[in-house]
């Protein structure tokens, strides 16, 4: 019974957004409510008084952009919450996509001023593919933004998801007065810069109550009554199962920087968000209730602490109980491993954990045994499916500026690409090292980290490739011939899989047409190594 109750009390989720929508600020407020931190570090353009807890790498502090997925745990209302913060910047989208494989639900932050943006669309596409339950937080109501009904319509249309308002704002910008909680029938009045846990709530079970007019004024009270009547008529009651199936997204309004509207959402999240769920593996369906341990590595982070050459692998527990000092089976390496100092996280703050349950994320000190997608079990041979590697969009040759540092460069490239920061390719039949990334900022991060963590100085030369496609074929001879004739455009990824580097969409389509026996894949399952 204890095992089942441990599963039910856990919620593991990610916060996702377009850059600057307020994701990191919202993360800080959640940690405040959970008692994990005492002061929130507001992230403002290059004026950071206190570096945000979840932005713990030096390069993040310089840029004010979360570029590494942080893992934070806290307790709230008897529930253990595991929050995975993700890079908002589009150049680090693959890290975010991979993190979505480790969560059971998502909170999507939308800027009320800018509405749906490019990165939001891409992230929601992954959520739809995985049928991940989504809660929407419409942020920055204290600024003049889009009409609330227009914004709901835009989100539904652009993201192909049905919405269900759970709170409703009274005005916005300088006239923003608060939010009405449609579930609890209560009014929360807004005052800028109030204390984080201040609770200025008025219970209003009947909207015709005169206290509404006294609190808001006649005009705004009349508008709220009209809005709520319309919302009730259109949306009715939320069906929690429709939310958990990924069909309906509850919507909350607020201002994260002012800690407003956040508590209502957090309370609802605890109430309706799914606990850890079942998983698919290469051999069978795995029930979360199974008592034998299993889990997978979804992220590797080299060198969290510059003073120590740490390398930490992040493990998502999927079933059973993880125990410190117990031997577990590393499926890919076919060997047993144990961990004497597994950690849980509050960003940089680590604490040793003796056991962990489904939904928990555990940090494991790693000496190079792990790759993303690796599976640990109690002996059973399977791996978890649906952990993808995506085709990069920008390709550059790595040029070593100091031949004396060749070993350091090789080690750095292997470790950084093991983390999933970028993908490493080696030209077929040669030694040319090619880095593939989703965006330019990743190259800056790699260059910075190679120099500061490994002492290797590099420059990157641009290459004229459009996409990388993994090659497979049932006809080994045809594949061998293709590789021989197209060797200038063929490389191997770090796991030895063949990749075709297409110079344009036209070249790719031509090769597909001319080589019907060969399959060109835009994604690769990372477990194939």
Residue ranges and their predicted role:
Residues 1-529:
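Structural and coupling elements of P-loop NTPases
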